[in-house]
Amino acid sequence: MKAPVRVAVTGAAGQIGYALLFRIASGEMLGKDQPVILQLLELSNEKAQAALKGVMMELEDCAFPLLAGMVGTDDAEVAFKDIDVALLVGARPRGPGMERKDLLLENAKIFTAQGAALNKVAKRDVKVLVVGNPANTNAYIAMESAPDLNPKNFTAMLRLDHNRALSQLSLKLGKPVGGIEKLVVWGNHSPTMYPDYRFATSDGASIGDAINDQEWNAGTFIPTVGKRGAAIIEARGLSSAASAANAAIDHVRDWVLGSNGKWVTMGVPSDGSYGIPEGVIFGFPVTTENGQYTLVKDLPIDDFSQKYIDKTLAELEEERSGVSHLLG
C-alpha cells in the first residue's frame, strides 16, 4: 500500500465540500490505490464546527478503505501541516448590497492568512487549488503571501468553465463530450472568461469548421458559458456545488496523475506568454505530466479573441490593484 497523501480542504462542511470529500475519500481524485488523510478546515463558530463534525461522522460511516485518517479544525496551521494537496474552497460569499471591491477585500484577508499558513507548515511541493471566488485573485493573494513556496504550486479553478464549455459544444454538435479535445478557456473565472474552440476537435475533426457560425459563438456560446453559474442559482436557488466539486477533482487528478497529452484549462501564474503580464493568475491551456503542468505555447490569437482576452485581463488587473495595498 502506498503511503497516505495529506489533503487539506477548507470550507469543508459547505455545499462544495460536502460534494467533494466523499469522492476524494473513495479515490476518485488521486487514484484507487492511493490512501488519503483528510485535513478539514472550517470556521470557528459553533454551527460550522458542528456541521464539520457531522460530515466527518458520515465519512467514517462510509468505511472507505482509502481513508487513512481525518483531522477537523478551525486552525489553518493544523489543517495545512505537512499537506501534499490543498483545496481552498472556503471563501466569503457576496452578501446583499455588498460591493465587489468589499468582497475582494474580505477574501484578501482570508487568503493572506491561508497563504502564510501554507508557507509555514505545508510541504514545499504542495499543490494548491483555489476554488473559492474570486478564484484567480484569491490564488494570487495566497501565492504572494507564501514567498518560500514556488509560485507554480498555486492554481485557480477554471475547470468548471472548461467543462461547461465542453458540454455546450457537445450539445451543439450532437456528439459525445468525451471525443472533444483542444478546447481553451482564457482568463478569469468570471463571466468575462473566454471559451475558445478555434483549435478544438471532435473525434479529430475541426469543431470550428463543423459549427462555422460566429453569430452563435459570440451571441450564444460565450454568454451561455459565462453566465452558467448565475443560471444555476436562478434555477436551483443555490450556487453550483456538485459541478464545482467535480471540476476540482478533474483539475487535481490531471495535475497529479497527468492529462495524457490532452489540453486542460488551469488558472496559473503567467510566464509572460500571450502578452499576459508575468505573475497574473490567468486561465491558459496546459498539458500535465509527472505532477507538473506545461503551458501550450504559440497559439495564434486573432482579433476577435484578443478583444476577449484583453477584457478578462483588464478585470484581473483591476482586481489585483484593488488588493495590492494589502500585499506590501
From Swiss-Prot:
The keyword Signal does not apply. The keyword NAD applies. CDD domains: MDH_chloroplast-like. InterPro entries: L-lactate/malate_DH, Lactate/malate_DH_C, Lactate/malate_DH_N, Lactate_DH/Glyco_Ohase_4_C, Malate_DH_type2, NAD(P)-bd_dom_sf. One of its GO terms (molecular function) is L-malate dehydrogenase (NAD+) activity. Keywords: NAD, Oxidoreductase, Tricarboxylic acid cycle. Its EC number is 1.1.1.37. It is an enzyme of class 1 (oxidoreductase). Pfam families: Ldh_1_C (PF02866), Ldh_1_N (PF00056). It catalyses: (S)-malate + NAD(+) = oxaloacetate + NADH + H(+). The active site is at H189 (proton acceptor). Substrate binds at R94, R100, N133, R164. Catalyzes the reversible oxidation of malate to oxaloacetate. Belongs to the LDH/MDH superfamily. MDH type 2 family. This is Malate dehydrogenase.
